[in-house]
Amino acid sequence: MKDKIIDNAITLFSEKGYDGTTLDDIAKSVNIKKASLYYHFDSKKSIYEQSVKCCFDYLNNIIMMNQNKSNYSIDALYQFLFEFIFDIEERYIRMYVQLSNTPEEFSGNIYGQIQDLNQSLSKEIAKFYDESKIKMTKEDFQNLILLFLESWYLKASFSQKFGAVEESKSQFKDEVYSLLNIFLKK
Protein backbone atom coordinates (compact mmCIF):
# COMPACT_ATOMS: atom_id res chain seq x y z
CA MET A 1 0.00 0.00 0.00
CA LYS A 2 2.89 2.35 0.76
CA ASP A 3 4.16 2.12 -2.83
CA LYS A 4 0.67 2.71 -4.20
CA ILE A 5 0.29 5.80 -2.03
CA ILE A 6 3.57 7.21 -3.34
CA ASP A 7 2.74 6.28 -6.92
CA ASN A 8 -0.59 8.10 -6.76
CA ALA A 9 0.91 11.00 -4.80
CA ILE A 10 3.48 11.56 -7.56
CA THR A 11 0.64 11.98 -10.04
CA LEU A 12 -1.26 14.33 -7.74
CA PHE A 13 1.78 16.45 -6.83
CA SER A 14 2.75 16.66 -10.51
CA GLU A 15 -0.70 17.98 -11.38
CA LYS A 16 -1.49 20.18 -8.38
CA GLY A 17 1.84 20.90 -6.74
CA TYR A 18 2.53 20.50 -3.04
CA ASP A 19 0.14 23.17 -1.81
CA GLY A 20 -2.69 22.10 -4.11
CA THR A 21 -2.58 18.44 -3.07
CA THR A 22 -4.33 17.47 0.16
CA LEU A 23 -4.08 14.36 2.27
CA ASP A 24 -7.75 13.78 1.39
CA ASP A 25 -6.81 13.77 -2.31
CA ILE A 26 -4.08 11.22 -1.68
CA ALA A 27 -6.31 9.02 0.50
CA LYS A 28 -9.15 9.08 -2.05
CA SER A 29 -6.75 8.17 -4.86
CA VAL A 30 -5.93 4.88 -3.12
CA ASN A 31 -9.43 4.31 -1.69
CA ILE A 32 -8.54 4.59 1.97
CA LYS A 33 -9.54 6.96 4.74
CA LYS A 34 -7.30 9.90 5.48
CA ALA A 35 -6.57 8.51 8.94
CA SER A 36 -5.23 5.32 7.34
CA LEU A 37 -2.50 7.34 5.59
CA TYR A 38 -0.96 7.94 9.00
CA TYR A 39 -0.37 4.22 9.37
CA HIS A 40 2.07 4.43 6.44
CA PHE A 41 3.34 8.03 6.64
CA ASP A 42 3.48 10.52 9.47
CA SER A 43 2.66 13.59 7.35
CA LYS A 44 2.02 15.05 3.92
CA LYS A 45 5.59 16.30 4.08
CA SER A 46 6.97 12.75 4.34
CA ILE A 47 4.76 11.61 1.43
CA TYR A 48 6.06 14.52 -0.64
CA GLU A 49 9.69 13.86 0.24
CA GLN A 50 9.33 10.21 -0.72
CA SER A 51 7.56 11.20 -3.96
CA VAL A 52 10.37 13.60 -4.87
CA LYS A 53 12.94 10.90 -4.11
CA CYS A 54 11.11 8.47 -6.40
CA CYS A 55 11.02 11.10 -9.15
CA PHE A 56 14.79 11.61 -8.96
CA ASP A 57 15.39 7.85 -8.73
CA TYR A 58 13.33 7.40 -11.89
CA LEU A 59 15.27 10.09 -13.79
CA ASN A 60 18.62 8.73 -12.60
CA ASN A 61 17.54 5.26 -13.71
CA ILE A 62 16.98 6.60 -17.25
CA ILE A 63 20.57 7.85 -17.25
CA MET A 64 21.85 4.51 -15.94
CA MET A 65 19.93 2.60 -18.62
CA ASN A 66 21.61 4.73 -21.28
CA GLN A 67 25.03 3.85 -19.85
CA ASN A 68 24.24 0.19 -20.42
CA LYS A 69 23.28 0.55 -24.06
CA SER A 70 25.04 3.56 -25.54
CA ASN A 71 27.89 3.58 -28.01
CA TYR A 72 28.24 7.36 -27.45
CA SER A 73 27.98 8.38 -31.09
CA ILE A 74 26.15 11.47 -32.35
CA ASP A 75 23.22 9.26 -33.38
CA ALA A 76 23.19 7.76 -29.89
CA LEU A 77 23.18 11.31 -28.44
CA TYR A 78 20.11 12.15 -30.49
CA GLN A 79 18.42 8.96 -29.30
CA PHE A 80 19.34 9.65 -25.67
CA LEU A 81 17.98 13.21 -25.85
CA PHE A 82 14.78 12.02 -27.49
CA GLU A 83 14.23 9.28 -24.90
CA PHE A 84 15.10 11.57 -22.00
CA ILE A 85 12.32 13.93 -23.08
CA PHE A 86 9.63 11.81 -24.71
CA ASP A 87 10.00 8.32 -23.24
CA ILE A 88 9.73 9.51 -19.66
CA GLU A 89 6.34 9.31 -18.02
CA GLU A 90 4.61 12.68 -18.18
CA ARG A 91 4.06 12.88 -14.44
CA TYR A 92 7.81 12.72 -13.77
CA ILE A 93 8.49 15.57 -16.16
CA ARG A 94 5.67 17.60 -14.64
CA MET A 95 6.82 16.77 -11.11
CA TYR A 96 10.34 17.90 -11.99
CA VAL A 97 8.98 21.15 -13.43
CA GLN A 98 6.75 21.60 -10.34
CA LEU A 99 9.80 21.48 -8.09
CA SER A 100 10.45 25.13 -8.93
CA ASN A 101 7.34 25.96 -6.87
CA THR A 102 8.21 23.76 -3.92
CA PRO A 103 7.75 25.32 -0.47
CA GLU A 104 10.91 26.75 1.09
CA GLU A 105 11.12 24.01 3.72
CA PHE A 106 12.03 21.47 1.01
CA SER A 107 14.31 23.64 -1.10
CA GLY A 108 17.66 22.62 0.41
CA ASN A 109 17.04 18.91 0.01
CA ILE A 110 15.53 19.26 -3.44
CA TYR A 111 18.28 21.59 -4.63
CA GLY A 112 20.84 18.96 -3.60
CA GLN A 113 18.97 16.27 -5.53
CA ILE A 114 18.72 18.54 -8.60
CA GLN A 115 22.47 19.15 -8.42
CA ASP A 116 23.15 15.42 -8.15
CA LEU A 117 20.88 14.68 -11.12
CA ASN A 118 22.47 17.44 -13.20
CA GLN A 119 25.93 16.15 -12.31
CA SER A 120 24.99 12.61 -13.41
CA LEU A 121 23.41 13.95 -16.57
CA SER A 122 26.39 16.18 -17.31
CA LYS A 123 28.79 13.23 -16.89
CA GLU A 124 26.67 11.15 -19.23
CA ILE A 125 26.52 13.92 -21.83
CA ALA A 126 30.31 14.36 -21.61
CA LYS A 127 30.70 10.78 -22.84
CA PHE A 128 29.17 11.82 -26.17
CA TYR A 129 31.83 14.48 -26.68
CA ASP A 130 34.30 13.68 -29.42
CA GLU A 131 36.88 16.41 -29.97
CA SER A 132 37.49 15.27 -33.53
CA LYS A 133 33.83 15.79 -34.46
CA ILE A 134 32.70 18.69 -32.27
CA LYS A 135 33.91 22.25 -32.70
CA MET A 136 33.41 23.53 -29.16
CA THR A 137 34.90 22.77 -25.78
CA LYS A 138 33.60 19.86 -23.76
CA GLU A 139 32.22 22.24 -21.12
CA ASP A 140 30.38 24.33 -23.71
CA PHE A 141 29.02 21.15 -25.28
CA GLN A 142 27.73 19.90 -21.92
CA ASN A 143 26.18 23.25 -21.02
CA LEU A 144 24.48 23.58 -24.39
CA ILE A 145 22.97 20.10 -24.21
CA LEU A 146 21.81 20.65 -20.60
CA LEU A 147 20.24 23.97 -21.55
CA PHE A 148 18.52 22.30 -24.49
CA LEU A 149 17.16 19.53 -22.25
CA GLU A 150 15.86 21.96 -19.62
CA SER A 151 14.02 24.04 -22.20
CA TRP A 152 12.52 20.91 -23.73
CA TYR A 153 11.37 19.66 -20.33
CA LEU A 154 9.23 22.78 -20.07
CA LYS A 155 7.94 22.35 -23.62
CA ALA A 156 7.25 18.65 -23.08
CA SER A 157 5.28 19.26 -19.88
CA PHE A 158 2.97 21.65 -21.73
CA SER A 159 2.71 19.61 -24.93
CA GLN A 160 1.71 16.54 -22.92
CA LYS A 161 -0.84 18.53 -20.96
CA PHE A 162 -2.42 19.93 -24.11
CA GLY A 163 -2.13 16.79 -26.23
CA ALA A 164 0.41 18.02 -28.75
CA VAL A 165 3.06 15.36 -28.17
CA GLU A 166 3.39 14.17 -31.78
CA GLU A 167 3.70 17.74 -33.03
CA SER A 168 6.33 18.36 -30.35
CA LYS A 169 8.28 15.27 -31.39
CA SER A 170 8.50 16.59 -34.92
CA GLN A 171 9.58 20.02 -33.68
CA PHE A 172 12.12 18.40 -31.35
CA LYS A 173 13.59 16.39 -34.21
CA ASP A 174 14.09 19.56 -36.26
CA GLU A 175 15.57 21.47 -33.33
CA VAL A 176 17.95 18.74 -32.20
CA TYR A 177 19.30 18.31 -35.73
CA SER A 178 19.81 22.08 -35.93
CA LEU A 179 21.59 21.97 -32.58
CA LEU A 180 23.80 19.06 -33.62
CA ASN A 181 24.68 20.82 -36.87
CA ILE A 182 25.81 23.89 -34.93
CA PHE A 183 28.56 22.13 -33.05
CA LEU A 184 29.55 19.34 -35.41
CA LYS A 185 32.70 19.87 -37.45
CA LYS A 186 32.08 19.71 -41.15
From Swiss-Prot:
Keywords: DNA-binding, Repressor, Transcription, Transcription regulation. PROSITE patterns: HTH_TETR_2. Residues 1-59 form the HTH tetR-type domain. GO terms for molecular function: DNA binding. InterPro entries: Homeodomain-like_sf, HTH-type_Tx_Regulator, HTH_TetR, IcaR_C. Homodimer. This is Biofilm operon icaADBC HTH-type negative transcriptional regulator IcaR. It comes from Staphylococcus aureus (strain COL).
